[in-house]
């Protein structure tokens, strides 16, 4: 079945052809009696016809776009198809003469609201799925954090036991004294070694 848009396009072409047919070259030449008939008047006539046809088609395209007629024609086709389907399956016809304009408009917009509702439901399902994935990721990160904390606590406990064992054996004090002896060499190695050498020389004398 031909769509409403195709029918409207065909109507435009037919109307343009009929209009142009009423402007033949002979009648056009009569508007310029001072000009001789020939190629010049024929070229002017052809250019005028082409300009007229192009302007009409451009205006038609602008009108279709500004009023969104393609979408509205598709909606009309859909409404007619639904009505024919209901009639074919024995559903009673709706007498719109007894309906208020608000009811007619509501019925007209029902299908579009239904499409919008379906889209919103799909978006909601997508969001739920995304949230589920994020929850799984967060749970995994929490588990990894807990494992890391547990390992750190275990290491701290081992360190505390090691320090406690060193204190019992008096190793901690020895390590502390040794570190204090080495600290000057670490902080200022050049001057420390010089002083040490001078002291050694004095002892030998």
Curated annotation (Swiss-Prot):
Q: Which UniProt keywords apply?
A: Cell cycle, Cell division, Centromere, Chromosome, Kinetochore, Meiosis, Mitosis, Nucleus
What's one GO BP annotation on this UniProt entry?
chromosome segregation
Coiled-coil residues are: none
Under InterPro entries, the record lists: Nnf1, PMF1/Nnf1
Main localisation: nucleus
An annotated GO cellular component: outer kinetochore
Highest taxon above the source species: Eukaryota
The subcellular localization recorded is:
Nucleus; Chromosome, Centromere, Kinetochore
| PANTHER family from the UniProt entry | POLYAMINE-MODULATED FACTOR 1
Q: Relate the assembly described in the record.
A: Component of the Mis12c/MINDc subcomplex in the outer kinetochore. The KMN (Knl1c-Mis12c-Ndc80c) protein network forms the outer layer of kinetochores. The KMN network is composed of three subcomplexes: Knl1c (spc7 and sos7), Mis12c/MINDc (mis12, nnf1, mis13, and mis14), and Ndc80c (ndc80, nuf2, spc24, and spc25). The mis12-nnf1 protein dimer directly binds to the centromere histone cnp3.
- Reported function: Part of the Mis12c/MINDc subcomplex in the outer kinetochore which has a role in kinetochore function during late meiotic prophase and throughout the mitotic cell cycle.
Name this protein carries in UniProt: Kinetochore protein nnf1
What is the organism of origin for this protein? Schizosaccharomyces pombe (strain 972 / ATCC 24843)
Gene of origin?
A: nnf1
């Amino acid at each position: 079945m031909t769509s409403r848009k195709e029918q409207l396009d065909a109507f435009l072409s037919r109307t343009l052809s009929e209009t142009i047919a009423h402007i033949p070259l002979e009648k056009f030449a009569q508007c310029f009696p001072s000009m001789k008939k020939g190629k010049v008047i024929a070229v002017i006539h052809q250019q005028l016809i082409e300009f007229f046809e192009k302007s009409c088609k451009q205006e038609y395209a602008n009108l279709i776009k500004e009023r969104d007629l393609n979408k509205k024609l598709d909606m009309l086709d859909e409404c007619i198809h639904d009505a024919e389907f209901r009639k074919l399956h024995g559903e009673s016809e709706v007498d719109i003469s007894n309906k208020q304009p608000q009811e007619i408009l509501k019925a007209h917009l029902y299908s579009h609201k239904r499409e919008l509702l379906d889209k919103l439901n799909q978006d909601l399902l997508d969001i739920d799925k995304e949230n589920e994935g994020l929850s799984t990721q967060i749970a995994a990160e929490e588990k990894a954090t807990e494992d890391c904390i547990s390992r750190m606590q275990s290491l701290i406990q081992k360190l505390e036991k090691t320090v406690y064992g060193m204190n019992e054996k008096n190793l901690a004090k020895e390590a502390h004294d040794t570190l204090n002896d080495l600290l000057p060499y670490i902080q200022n190695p050049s001057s420390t070694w010089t002083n040490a050498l001078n002291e050694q020389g004095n002892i030998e004398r």
